């Protein structure tokens, strides 16, 4: 990134209403407890509509039936999405059995949704079941605290089951960072777990009384895999190992993908390298980055409030120097690292500890019993007999981890009988979508429900041009907020309106380049026509090992985005 002429450290002006809401919330309590007892509405009112996000929930409604209910003079069918806090995506089989039961008995849709932030979501929780879901999670050692809104969200960690010691060390740091940056308010325990109010005054030494200016995302990355897409995140710790043992981290700050259609003050941005730090400084540095963003982030405009905008406003070197000052360290030069891929290796792999790990492809992360493919039941049966754990990946897949040789055949039999090991193409394995319709209130176009048939068409194009054994990193996101991480794909579709998308090209396979808009507001048939031509050219003209995104740049089909704060919209 180029060093912009430094602007003010703090943006003066009228604060957003979200800042008022946080300040008046009494450390995130609001009147949520009273609202829970209001049976006249299925939703939360006023500030509570937003405050519940700090408790891991979003209020949604079924948009497929919204108009019909309005005609009947009924309020929307309100239901909550709940997102679990699950650092590194590791979940025990006992915990899995509990969430399977809750999803089946207490949600409208009956499904478990794995997300690309290495956790699971329940969709369709009615208000009467909101308190029970938090209590169920607590009973098995889980919670939903700080998985949404202006806090440090679920901390990601590379799903690396092969190098077991390195993964274990990195995973422990992901958990430590998550715990260190959690809010200290007792509001969650008081409201959901019926814990008594104590006489002490709440304090938030790291997050502050009004918490962060905007959402904040953190990762721990183990090269050469970039499965967690570090450039989508505010703060990234890239593991540096010597002889298979973790010795420290490279720190990268200021990634983020959310944009707003037509608003050139918004942009996706890759993270900036700050330097290397030994392990013992990890928590101090994490706290310093968060508190610098807390104090310098823009609280007058939520569309310009994320860390990426703070870095561009004050300058990377200024922000870095402040982190060094607060953490009491000087960063060492970045240690060498490289990424070679970010997809999951589907199927069995043997770890260096001689245990086996089975990565299951879960299309769109949606776990449900389908006709002839009882995925949810199959995973429950595996959870009942498996002695290791499950690991949710940042590609919305699931790893059955730590399987001894003696148990391998038994688990494989259940997986195959349940449709969990059905063969899929490389293209389908490397495609992803966010949830979008019918539950997401921000959705502009279909994503999860659109992707399977769209990939059928892409598979046909790949076969037509003789590249069925290849893949293109392809992602669909239903709106420009970018949950599907389309703005780090080789081919990214960003929802614009029902049935219409902006087509972005020119990202790369390893997720280190932002794609540029190639065509705007086009239909599926127009997208397929464009890709038919371009895949054909790639098949004929590519260099050895050249990915589709790199080809589109080299062939002059699309100009690479070099400095997105300045040239993304050119």
From Swiss-Prot:
<comment type="function">
    <text>Component of the sulfite reductase complex that catalyzes the 6-electron reduction of sulfite to sulfide. This is one of several activities required for the biosynthesis of L-cysteine from sulfate.</text>
</comment>
<dbReference type="InterPro" id="IPR005117">
    <property type="entry name" value="NiRdtase/SiRdtase_haem-b_fer"/>
</dbReference>
<feature type="binding site">
    <location>
        <position position="434"/>
    </location>
    <ligand>
        <name>[4Fe-4S] cluster</name>
    </ligand>
</feature>
<keyword id="KW-0004">4Fe-4S</keyword>
<dbReference type="GO" id="GO:0009337">
    <property type="term" value="C:sulfite reductase complex (NADPH)"/>
</dbReference>
<comment type="subunit">
    <text>Alpha(8)-beta(8). The alpha component is a flavoprotein, the beta component is a hemoprotein.</text>
</comment>
<comment type="similarity">
    <text>Belongs to the nitrite and sulfite reductase 4Fe-4S domain family.</text>
</comment>
<comment type="pathway">
    <text>Sulfur metabolism; hydrogen sulfide biosynthesis; hydrogen sulfide from sulfite (NADPH route): step 1/1.</text>
</comment>
<dbReference type="GO" id="GO:0000103">
    <property type="term" value="P:sulfate assimilation"/>
</dbReference>
<dbReference type="InterPro" id="IPR011786">
    <property type="entry name" value="CysI"/>
</dbReference>
<keyword id="KW-0479">Metal-binding</keyword>
<keyword id="KW-0521">NADP</keyword>
<dbReference type="GO" id="GO:0004783">
    <property type="term" value="F:sulfite reductase (NADPH) activity"/>
</dbReference>
<dbReference type="GO" id="GO:0019344">
    <property type="term" value="P:cysteine biosynthetic process"/>
</dbReference>
<feature type="binding site">
    <location>
        <position position="440"/>
    </location>
    <ligand>
        <name>[4Fe-4S] cluster</name>
    </ligand>
</feature>
<protein>
    <recommendedName>
        <fullName>Sulfite reductase [NADPH] hemoprotein beta-component</fullName>
        <ecNumber>1.8.1.2</ecNumber>
    </recommendedName>
</protein>
<dbReference type="InterPro" id="IPR036136">
    <property type="entry name" value="Nit/Sulf_reduc_fer-like_dom_sf"/>
</dbReference>
<dbReference type="GO" id="GO:0050311">
    <property type="term" value="F:sulfite reductase (ferredoxin) activity"/>
</dbReference>
<dbReference type="Pfam" id="PF01077">
    <property type="entry name" value="NIR_SIR"/>
</dbReference>
<dbReference type="InterPro" id="IPR006066">
    <property type="entry name" value="NO2/SO3_Rdtase_FeS/sirohaem_BS"/>
</dbReference>
<keyword id="KW-0560">Oxidoreductase</keyword>
<dbReference type="InterPro" id="IPR045854">
    <property type="entry name" value="NO2/SO3_Rdtase_4Fe4S_sf"/>
</dbReference>
<dbReference type="GO" id="GO:0051539">
    <property type="term" value="F:4 iron, 4 sulfur cluster binding"/>
</dbReference>
<keyword id="KW-0411">Iron-sulfur</keyword>
<keyword id="KW-0349">Heme</keyword>
<keyword id="KW-0198">Cysteine biosynthesis</keyword>
<feature type="binding site">
    <location>
        <position position="483"/>
    </location>
    <ligand>
        <name>[4Fe-4S] cluster</name>
    </ligand>
</feature>
<dbReference type="GO" id="GO:0020037">
    <property type="term" value="F:heme binding"/>
</dbReference>
<feature type="binding site" description="axial binding residue">
    <location>
        <position position="483"/>
    </location>
    <ligand>
        <name>siroheme</name>
    </ligand>
</feature>
<dbReference type="GO" id="GO:0050661">
    <property type="term" value="F:NADP binding"/>
</dbReference>
<feature type="binding site">
    <location>
        <position position="479"/>
    </location>
    <ligand>
        <name>[4Fe-4S] cluster</name>
    </ligand>
</feature>
<dbReference type="GO" id="GO:0070814">
    <property type="term" value="P:hydrogen sulfide biosynthetic process"/>
</dbReference>
<dbReference type="GO" id="GO:0046872">
    <property type="term" value="F:metal ion binding"/>
</dbReference>
<dbReference type="Pfam" id="PF03460">
    <property type="entry name" value="NIR_SIR_ferr"/>
</dbReference>
<dbReference type="InterPro" id="IPR006067">
    <property type="entry name" value="NO2/SO3_Rdtase_4Fe4S_dom"/>
</dbReference>
<keyword id="KW-0408">Iron</keyword>
<dbReference type="InterPro" id="IPR045169">
    <property type="entry name" value="NO2/SO3_Rdtase_4Fe4S_prot"/>
</dbReference>
<keyword id="KW-0028">Amino-acid biosynthesis</keyword>
